[in-house]
Curated annotation (Swiss-Prot):
One of its GO terms (molecular function) is nickel cation binding. InterPro entries: UreF, UreF_sf. UreD, UreF and UreG form a complex that acts as a GTP-hydrolysis-dependent molecular chaperone, activating the urease apoprotein by helping to assemble the nickel containing metallocenter of UreC. The UreE protein probably delivers the nickel. This is Urease accessory protein UreF. Required for maturation of urease via the functional incorporation of the urease nickel metallocenter.
């Protein structure tokens, strides 16, 4: 990947990107407080499951489709996969987060003069739809885009765990290090999934997100 494209990807996955993803826990706060996911080992196992069985079978295959569609300027496919992603969110909390962060990224990309971003301010947009628009515009290759997407998600989840648990910084880094091979394996596996097999349901994750919507005391947005 060209150095400038690499820098653009680093910008896109930075926690400093002003899209508000830090405000959401994706059910992890409830899982820690009420679901017994309260040790570094359990955090690792939870995140590994969501990455490999959830994001890897739902978001990543569509990421590749969206990159192709943006490259071909195929707006029918872009709209179709955007709607598919929103429909795949298993709880209201996950749907609201996806639309909120997607709109925030659309606004940012518009302000950065990325062509094609502005129309998404007026319609429901999945984060991944705008993420792939940015990657296509900045010549970020598909594998790097997929790894970057997973890494951004994972870092945010580790931040959630650090704020909710007494999770030491070194323990958090150990989790990240252990999950790096999972990210590469998940991206490779996602390239082999046939379109009719896109999608997955994780009942435990969905229940954690649903319960977080009504959690009495919480740090993260619902």
């Amino acid at each position: 990947m060209p150095p400038l494209a690499l820098l653009k990807l680093m910008n896109l996955i930075s926690p400093a990107l002003p899209v508000g993803a830090f405000a959401y826990s994706q059910g992890l706060e409830w899982a820690i407080d009420h679901g017994g996911i309260d040790t570094p080992e359990k955090i690792h196992d939870w995140l590994q499951g969501v990455i490999s069985q959830g994001l890897g079978k739902t978001d990543l295959p569509v990421l590749f489709k969206l990159l192709q569609a943006w490259g071909a300027n195929d707006h029918e496919q872009i709209n179709s996969w955007n709607a598919w992603l929103l429909a795949a969110r298993e709880t209201q909390e996950l749907l609201d987060e996806d639309r909120h962060v997607g709109k925030a990224l659309a606004k940012l990309l518009r302000d950065l003069n990325v062509p094609g971003a502005e129309p998404w301010l007026e319609r429901p947009a999945s984060l991944l739809t705008l993420w792939t628009l940015a990657c296509a515009h900045w010549d970020i290759d598909a594998e790097s885009a997929a790894l970057g997407f997973l890494w951004s998600w994972l870092e945010n989840q580790i931040a959630v765990a650090g704020k909710t648990l007494p999770l030491a910084q070194t323990a958090a880094q150990r989790i990240l290090q252990r999950l790096m091979p999972v990210l590469t394996e998940t991206v490779a596996a996602a390239t082999q999934i046939k379109e009719e097999d896109f999608g997955a349901s994780l009942p435990g994750w969905a229940m954690a997100c649903a319960n977080h919507e009504t959690q009495y005391s919480r740090l993260f947005r619902s």
